[in-house]
Amino acid sequence: MKFNGFIVAIVVLAALGGALYWSNHHMPAETTPASAEAPPKILTLNEADINKIDIKKKGGEEVTLAKDSGGNWKVIAPKPLGADQSAVSSMLSSLSSLNSDRLVEEKTSNFNQYGLSEPTLQIGVTEKNSKTHQLLVGDDTPTNNGAYVRLEGDPRVFTIAAYNKTSLDKSLNDLRDKRLLTLESDKISRIELIANKQEIEFGRNKDQWQILRPKPLRADSAQVDELLRKLTDAKMESGSETDSKKTASAFTSGARVAIAKLTTDSGTQELEVRKNKDDYYAKSSVVDGVYKASNDVGQGFYKKLDDFRNKKLFDFGFSDPDKIEIHDGSKAYFLTKGGQDWWSGDGKKMDATSVESLIDKIRDLQATKFLESGFNTPSIDVTVSSNDRKRREKALIAKYKDSYIAKRENEPVLYELDSKLIEALQNSAKDLKPAAMSKK
């Protein structure tokens, strides 16, 4: 028994010793010193203070960008060009807070071994206080996952990650404004389009487009905005000098698809698009040269006038009406909104769901096509007031063969409507009902 107790004591003592050893050799994480220092930063600059960038590539042309008085970047060398503001900002974001992957040498006497005596890339930045910084990029690391860099005047050699090198290694084509039309879309007040053997002119009043030519017509603003988006998004595709000559030749011999003009208070810009075989080519009044254009741009010019016309009978859209009046033969419906509630002509509070259903049916009224004649004595008229009753719209509707023709008050345009839309409107009007009485 005594011998067994002795054995137990030895086991307990060994366990306590092991626990003490583990405790002394496994300190809490927060007290364990870092195994290595964080790699040092190479550059820490305020991006907003940088007003000039110089990029030199070994064996290539030097590219210089500078901020103008409005704070926008411009290419000033090798020739004056607009700059892609987003691309320049992205590059500066990487450069102004450039981290190293590691510090290779604190002080070296042989930059040549890293390719830094004759760097493949040099990026110089000038701040508004005239202070300059020159980053030199040398050879790739042996594993090709980074590159050697240094700052001019600094004896240290660092490595940076390959993705950082990619974000800094930019050409003229990467940084220039590649838009074929450089006007800002929200400033454009007029669009002229010559395409499909037709000339169409659009004018914008606030956020609404109207057709001005060939005659004043209501425009589908969504369709005009889509045309404008294609024009302002059109970008050049750069290639070699040989490709440029082929592109110019293809444009010259191609068939004209469209000429589009965009106008703002500051002037007008023009884009001509031609098609040669299956490809589109574009020439701009503000950019030298001829460029291949995307199919998205080229195919956007094949719409007819009617494609840009507003087929909706009413303009109130998704604004809530304030007042609705419908006459359908001997039937009449009067609805007025007060606060959040709808009221009938005889002062009864109406069921909101049935009124919203009727409003939806009025919104749904749109033309299947436009007609030149056929309107006769109307059997239905619908009047809608909206925008705090500042907008009043009235439409007259007459039976026409198996469908209906509608005409907005004081406008000559005739809209052919599917008979199912009118039937849905009539049924929804019949289904109007007073609000349920609240239980006391």
Show the residue positions of the predicted features.
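A short-motif feature that recognizes glycine-rich, charge-decorated loops
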Residues: 1-440
